């Protein structure tokens, strides 16, 4: 693949990154009842003989603190702060349920296996779902489960979300792929380069796929889709760190990449992009590079601990390596003086490194500030 391929300087310029505004609630095509109806519609003679057993559960959790969030993450649960069966009227990076008091952790939505053992954390099962990719019975037999899935979209009023919805011929499923890059006039000779090791997530309703970019920003999802998808960057990195805090109290910040087709998203982040997105990508690359170079063969220095948590504060100037999440003990009074109004969130999540981003605008200055605190 050519080094300058999959660059897109225009994609994402009109995407907003504030609070998500929900639209109408939609009928979930993956509910077992809806898959069963679609199956009966296409295969009326088999409907009574083929059981549509749940493969997954669409749920929401209400964790009280960091410990409960960590417990969910340790069990492999990927959390989102907004419901999956609503249209999104206005794109954004975060959502807070209006029934949950400001300052408390909002409902966290997820899709878990049907046999998931729930921890002692408040939860609700919203729907029992059937996702053909996750079922062993779809690997054999003479039922076209892709056609059943598509029919479920049609019968639930979601046909417009299918790729080539107006066509009479079903579109082939595609594994989304693309490239996420960043460019700055004073870095890499002004040429775009990859946003490295960051998680890319996409979904249509409760069907998700996740993967990580490589060093050059390329990614390919492990699942195939026929519907349009919502894409996002989750700043949790393969090098063992996460970039957190952006008005939503979860350990890894999210930057939406908006809605696009199943072929994938290419995006080149620039200094003209939304500032939080640009800064997160710059910090991501600085931490990725620094940790990569801590090996004996390179700088031969001790790498930062894994599960490192980096917070960005866009209205503060000072930075610090407080290392609270990794066990350092500091005076609460000193932290409150340093963080000011932000100190109240310490009851939920503990940072290791805080980066003050006020007036830190260029890729090189963000990169330098990050490496300084990591050292």
Report the location of each language-model feature.
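Beta-strand-rich domain onsets/edges
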Residues: 2-3, 7, 22, 58, ...
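A short, Gly/Thr-enriched small/hydrophobic beta-strand-prone motif that recurs across taxa
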Residues: 157-188, 282-295
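Short, ordered, surface-exposed loop/turn motifs in non-cytosolic proteins
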Residues: 176, 182-205
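Zn2+-dependent metallopeptidase catalytic core
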Residues: 222-224, 271-309, 320-321
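Active-site scaffold of zinc-dependent metalloenzymes
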Residues: 323-370, 374
């Amino acid at each position: 693949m050519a080094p300058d391929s999959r660059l897109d300087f225009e994609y994402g310029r009109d995407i907003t990154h504030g609070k998500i505004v929900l639209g109408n609630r939609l009928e979930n095509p993956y509910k077992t009842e809806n898959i069963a109806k679609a199956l009966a519609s296409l295969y009326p003679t088999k409907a009574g003989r083929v059981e549509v057993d749940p493969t997954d559960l669409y749920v929401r959790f209400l964790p009280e603190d960091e410990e409960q969030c960590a417990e969910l993450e340790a069990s492999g649960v990927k959390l989102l702060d907004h419901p999956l069966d609503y249209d999104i009227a206005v794109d954004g990076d975060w959502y807070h349920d209006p029934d949950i008091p400001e300052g408390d952790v909002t409902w966290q939505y997820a899709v878990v296996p049907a046999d998931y053992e729930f921890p002692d954390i408040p939860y609700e099962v919203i729907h029992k779902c059937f996702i053909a990719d996750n079922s062993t019975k779809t690997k054999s037999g003479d039922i076209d489960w892709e056609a059943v899935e598509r029919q479920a979209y049609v019968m639930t009023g979601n046909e417009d979300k299918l790729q080539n919805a107006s066509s009479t011929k079903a579109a082939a499923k595609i594994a989304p792929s693309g490239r996420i890059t960043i460019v700055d006039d004073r870095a890499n000779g002004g040429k775009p380069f990859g946003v490295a090791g960051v998680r890319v997530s996409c979904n249509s309703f409760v069907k998700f796929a996740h993967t990580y970019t490589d060093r050059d920003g390329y990614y390919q999802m492990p699942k195939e889709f026929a519907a349009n998808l919502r894409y996002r960057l989750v700043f949790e990195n393969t090098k063992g760190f996460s970039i957190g805090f952006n008005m939503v109290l979860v350990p890894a910040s999210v930057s939406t990449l908006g809605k696009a087709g199943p072929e994938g998203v290419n995006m080149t982040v620039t200094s003209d992009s939304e500032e939080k997105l640009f800064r997160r990508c710059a910090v991501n690359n600085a931490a990725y590079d620094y940790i990569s170079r801590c090996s004996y063969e390179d700088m031969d220095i001790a790498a930062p601990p894994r599960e490192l948590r980096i917070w960005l504060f866009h209205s503060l100037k000072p930075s610090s390596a407080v290392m609270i999440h990794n066990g350092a003990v500091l005076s609460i009074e000193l932290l409150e003086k340093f963080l000011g109004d932000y100190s109240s969130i310490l009851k939920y999540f503990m940072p290791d490194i805080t980066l003050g981003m006020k007036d830190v605008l260029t890729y090189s200055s963000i990169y330098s500030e990050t490496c300084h605190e990591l050292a």
